[in-house]
Every structure is written in C-alpha cells, then in structure tokens.
Amino acid sequence: MQKLYNKLIKYNIKDAINFEEIDRQFLALKDLYLNKKMNNKNYLFLIITNSLICYQLSGKGEDYWEEFSEILENKEFNNFPEIYNFFEKFIPESRNNRRFIETKLKRVSKLENFYLEFLWKTEFYYKNMDKLILDLSKVMNQKADAKTIVFAVKIFSYWSRNIYDFQYFPENIMIPIDSRLENLYKKYENPLTPLPGGIKEFYINLSKKLNIPLLHLDAIVWVNYDELIK
C-alpha cells in the first residue's frame, strides 16, 4: 500500500471534490437542476431510484446519466406511480440501459414503501448519509457496502449539493469496489503480509492514511487510474 500512498499523497480532499465536480455525471445532474430551477424532492427520489438500476448498462455510465437528465427536462413527478411509470417506459427505450429490464423494474418497485419516508427526510439523509446507506440497504435487501447502494448515495449527494450546504461523505461509507480498485489492489498489496480484511481493509487503511473519506477517494482514483495502474 505504501507505494500507492506515495503516489496519492499530493492530493487532498479539496482535490477530490474538484474531481467530483468535473465528473460528467455530476455535470449532467447540475445542468438538469439549473434548467429545472426547482427543489422538487421527487427529483431526488427519482435520482436515487435511477442510481439503483445503474448497473449492467448497454452504454457508458456517463452517457446514460446525460441521456437520463436530458429526457427529464420536460417532465414533472408528483407521486410514486408516476415515477414508476416513467421508468417502465424509459428503460426499454434507453440507449444506454436496456439490459435486465424486468429485474430493474422490480428494483424500482421495492422503493414504493420508502417513497414517503424519503421525501420527509431528504435533508436529514443528506446530513446523515451513513443513515441513508443503512435504510437503502434494508429496503433493497442488500449489504450496506454493495456497489449500487454506495453509488446511489454518491449520486444523491451530487444532486443535493445544488440544494443544501455542502456535506462531506462520512468516513464509514465504503468505496464502491469495482474492477479498477481490484486491479490497483492486486498491483499494490503486499503478498508477504496479507491483510485479514483483504481489499476492503486495504482501502480503509489508505483512506485513513491520506485523511480522505473513502467515497471522496474514489474520485481521485477514477481520474488518475491510468497513471496509477502503470
């Protein structure tokens, strides 16, 4: 881990936030917010929902969020059935998310009982994103560190920054483990002193050493991955 730490020590949390805010997914949501010029909490719920079906895409994630944001510019939502009906029509017609349609619609359905609670607690959830992680994991019957659950909270934060005062990601939210992180772990782990907690412990230790919360660290790794993997 020390070699990876040495390459990342030049970055701090401000750098991470700057990287996040040039992310095409962040920019797509910011453009949507500016175009709509509204704080409708249904949009926050819609974005959480979309995050939870943002996997096994038929295109790039950045392209999908731009497509999603563009199609929302002329739409309004006032209740859960309207949100479900939107996804029921949108997913099969999407250029970038046409795979596993039935499975994804079932995931949307799971959120119905969470809808009203979420609308009441949006600001609370933004200030307590670790609580949102736990509640989403219960609703979706997934682990709190599951990639889609963590990603949903990340995207929720992206939109919420337009509405509320900026909040850092809590330190106890896990970084979403994907192929990039697995490749870096294989490259930089010390096989002579394996960690009991494996890849998760590796990144937790790196986060603490850099003093950058795990989910903010994700942005630094994303932007610098090609250099780090050399």
Which stretches of residues belong to each language-model region?
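HhH-family (HhH-GPD) DNA N-glycosylase catalytic core used in base-excision repair
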Residues: 1-230
